[in-house]
C-alpha cells in the first residue's frame, strides 16, 4: 500500500499534495509502469482521507497522462520514459544583460479565423437575432472597468516620467516582473524578468520568434490548427509543414520524417480539437528537441480556463528540469483573460536566446504603450488579476454547464458527441447527420447560428478529413445564458 506523509504538505491542499506525491513516485520509478494503483476507497482508508480527495488526485494524474484507467479493472501507471525531476546542476550563462538605462528604445490572436467559407455566410435571419458561436469578444460586465480606470489614473498621476521615457525593446521591467511572478504562482514556472518579452499580440511575437530562430528553419504546425502562424510564415517567406495528430497531439514520427527544425504546439488545450497532450508525448517531444538544434514554441493560450483539476505543467517547466540548454519558447496572451482589444501578449525565452534577442532584435521598439503596461503591472501585482480571472472562470463554467445540460436534454442528444469540454472556451460537437457538411452549414445559417466547422481548420494538405466532417467548433465565450435555450432549439430544428 502507498504511504504518504501529509505532515510535510505545508499550505498545499490534501488533493494537490497527494497528486504531487504520486506524480513524483511515478517519475522516480517507485511506482513502475503498468503497476496497478490502490482503489480509491482502499487508499483513502489507508491514508485517513476522503474518497473524493483520492478521486480528484487520480483524475488529475489521468488528465496529465501519468495514470490510465480501465473499466472494472482500476487505475494503472502509464509507461513513461525515464525523466529526471531534479533541478539542472549547471548554471545558464547568457552574457551581460543591458540595464534598463542602456536599452534603446494584424489583429490579436482570435480563436476563430475569418476564412472565406465563414466570412461569406449571410444569415437568413436578422443580425440582431443571430447567435454567434465564433465571436472572440467579451461582455461588458466581465471587464473590470472601474478598477482598470482607477489604476490608469494612478499611473498617469504617479508615473509621468516613466510614461514619457523611451520603451526598452522587451517591455517595461514592472510588467515583466509581474508576469514572471504570476507564472511562478499559477504555472509553477521559474522565470526571471530578463527572459520575458512583451508585444502587441501573439502574431507580432511569432514574427519576432521566426527572425530570432531563423527563417531558414523548417517549421511544423499542428493539423488541424490555428491558421495565423501559417499566414505569418507565408508572408515572411518562412517554410512550414502541416503535421498530423493523433489523440495525444503531434506525432513524433511526423517530425522526423518531415525534417522539422521547430514545431508550434498548444499542449494544454489544442485548438480546435481540445486535445490535452499527455506527459508521455510531452517527454517524447522534448527528447526530439534535444537531439539537435531544435525548438518548441509552446502556445499556452486559453490555459487559464481549465475547469477540472489543477493547471497542467508546461513544456517550458519540464524542459527546465533537464540539463538541456533550453529548447522551449513559451507564449501566452491576455486576450482571453482580459480583452482582445488590450493587445498585450508575452513570450518567455530560454536563457541562451535572451542575449541573442538583445543583439539581433534589440532595434525593435516595444509595441505596447507604457500606460497600458504600467496599468496591467499594477493590476497583477495588487491581486486584481487573480480575482478577475476567478470571477471570469466561474462565469464561463456556468455558461458551459448550462449549455451542456440543455444539449444533453434536447431531442437531438443521441445524434451528437462532445469532446474537449474541460478546458478552454470551446468544445467540439460532432453531429451524426445523413447530410453533407455544406447542407448542414446552410441549415445553420438559415437558423441564425454562426458557427465554425472543424474542417475549416485543416491546413491545405490535410489528407483524410473524415473525422472532422459535420463537427462544430462551439465557442461559447460570447454566449449569454438566456440565449442557450433558443440556441439548442435552433440546433435541434436545423438537424
Where are these regions (language model features)?
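N-terminal basic, amphipathic alpha-helical segments
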Residues: 1-153, 352, 362-369, 373, ...
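Conserved core of the PLP fold type I
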Residues: 152-292, 297, 304-305, 312-323, ...
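Short histidine/acidic/glycine/proline-rich micro-motifs that form metal-
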Residues: 137-140, 270-272, 302-305, 363
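Conserved core segment of the aminotransferase class I/II
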Residues: 324, 329-394
